[in-house]
Amino acid sequence: MDSFKGGMNLERLPESLRPQPSHDMASSFHLQRSSEPRDPIENSASESSDTDVPEKERSESRKTREDGGAGSAGCTGAADDPAKKKKQRRQRTHFTSQQLQELEATFQRNRYPDMSMREEIAVWTNLTEPRVRVWFKNRRAKWRKRERNQQMDLCKNGYVPQFSGLMQPYDDMYAGYPYNNWATKSLTPAPLSTKSFTFFNSMSPLSSQSMFSAPSSISSMNMPSGMGHSAVPGMANSGLNNINNISGSSLNSAMSSPACPYGPPGSPYSVYRDTCNSSLASLALKSKQHSSFGYSSLQSPGSSLNACQYN
């Protein structure tokens, strides 16, 4: 009884006398025991899943960031590729002497060849048409630069001395009208009182003769017919004598006057002599015409008179 009161000790009983548990109890016990250790496993799995989720999210976010960075880098690289290609300089074309001679000869003939001509040149020189076009473009730029430099050199060497030469007369502008001694300062200018003006010396004898011969011709034309034909030759001879005297005096004054500063000293006198001789000949012809006109005008009334009128 004590044993029953104190509890049944199953360990002291032999295995044959031990009560065998039923199948239901075993299954329930097994399920209970199997369910008990699964709780911590599930808890541990849940805990591990709770801890792994942020890590996975972090890893995924890192992967997405890395992928995005790689994509952006790829985009920037793709965007930089054309720039790199543009920055890369093309290799220079090395022309041979024969090609350069052919191109230079064509450039001397035509500085702006068209498309067909460039293609022909490319065939001749064994080059491509773009290379020929670029060569002509560079050659035209070089030619324009050379032309500008030459013009600048001409301006510097040509116009500066002329400007300095034009600035010289301001030193002695009112020192006696020294018009012809800009380059030669050693020549002393003549004073104003002794300097003869070239206006009267430059007058041709033809104009002076015409000035002085006009009154004689007018007087001979306006003479009355009653003075007779003897007055007409006298006036013509006096007019010729006056013309000779005037022409001689004008030539002597021209010879004695200083040379004209704006022309060679010996060239005008031969022209004056020729004009003088020609003017004298023309005046002689005019005087003969006037004399013949006077004779006819004087003789015409006498021929109309009858013999009875003289009585």
Curated annotation (Swiss-Prot):
Report biased composition (Basic and acidic residues) as residue ranges: 53-68
Which cysteine-cysteine pairs are annotated as disulfide bonds in the entry?
none
Q: Record's Gene3D superfamilies?
A: Homeodomain-like
Q: Which organism is it from?
A: Gallus gallus (Chicken)
Give the record's GO CC terms.
nucleus
Q: Does the keyword Kinase apply?
A: no
The record's DNA-binding region positions are 88-147
Keyword field contains Transferase = no
Biased region (Basic residues) positions are 84-93
One Gene Ontology term of the molecular function aspect: DNA-binding transcription factor activity, RNA polymerase II-specific
Alphabetically, which GO biological process terms does the record hold?
anatomical structure morphogenesis; regulation of transcription by RNA polymerase II
Which InterPro entries does the UniProt entry name for this protein?
HD (IPR001356), Homeobox_CS (IPR017970), Homeobox_Pitx/unc30 (IPR016233), Homeodomain-like_sf (IPR009057), OAR_dom (IPR003654)
Give compartment(s): Nucleus
Coding gene? PITX1
Q: What is its main location?
A: nucleus
- What is the protein name for this chain? Pituitary homeobox 1
Which keywords does this chain's UniProt record carry? Activator, Developmental protein, DNA-binding, Homeobox, Nucleus, Transcription, Transcription regulation
